[in-house]
């Protein structure tokens, strides 16, 4: 890792020289690219300096402990050493993630589709909990979320919830959320205190950029139907045919949207989801054909693959793909997902480049 850090520090010096050249402003695209690279390399430099500082403090504390005689001071130093070692481990993992080479698609917006699986109303309630978790995570990361479609259940959860997420490194950290999420807890309606198991399926679809030539949809291949939106009743039920259903005839992909009162807005949202699903289908097809690439991923990404279990009675969350178990489910549900997502990104990178330790 030290060799990679030194390479990055040398590259940072080069980038700083390039950015300081006044002629760079005549090429906005190049300047933008260098600015992003400078920001990433600066993060690596700061993380490396933090590690060096933490190592020095740890070294000094251990040196002091070796000669200390006072029991109170010994206890303080031992506590400081333990905290310092934990901090050093955390900083090292942070640096390891920063050293992962950026993927051109890292910053792509994604569309997340959450659906209630087995478990009926309890599964729908957990969809609602997951929606809240991802919104909180997005807030922590400085991302933007947009509701594209939502189908509420009778008890306040969601049968289906589709959201768009945009921001820096969105795809990088959310792509491994695809799969089946299993929840084990006692439902509020359970009178005997028995633990029930439910499931939620999540799809994560990278949203094609506007200039993405890979996804071309011919208007002639679309069938667009409009209908009256259905709601829970009352004054907010739309009396016009504002809901939109779009069918892509060649693939059979169907997308409906009725959240907006404007037919035009519903159509625009439905088209975004449609493009993402068609792009995803093409990517899945290519990856299935390239088995070598598939084996280098964290799990298959198949929506039927059970990837994670949330056990509320034990306050435990387990990601089955990398064998990671944490006993802080309460914090995870409050949006502190980085401890899982960063581990998944690191694992995927090690597999891809053949650095995975052999058992």
Curated annotation (Swiss-Prot):
Pfam families recorded: PCRF, RF-1
Residues with PTM N5-methylglutamine: 235
Main location: cytoplasm
Annotated GO CC locations: cytoplasm
Family annotation (SMART domains): PCRF (SM00937)
Gene Ontology MF, one: translation release factor activity, codon specific
Keywords from the UniProt entry: Cytoplasm, Methylation, Protein biosynthesis
Compartments (UniProt record): Cytoplasm
Family matches, as InterPro entries: PCRF, Pep_chain_release_fac_I, Pep_chain_release_fac_I_sf, Prokaryotic/Mito_RF, RF-1
Region (Disordered): 285-310
Posttranslational mods: Methylated by PrmC. Methylation increases the termination efficiency of RF1.
Its job: Peptide chain release factor 1 directs the termination of translation in response to the peptide chain termination codons UAG and UAA.
Alphabetical list of HAMAP family matching this protein: Rel_fac_1
Stated family: Belongs to the prokaryotic/mitochondrial release factor family.
PANTHER family reported for this sequence: LD18447P
Name assigned to this protein: Peptide chain release factor 1
Organism: Chlamydia muridarum (strain MoPn / Nigg)
The gene coding this protein: prfA
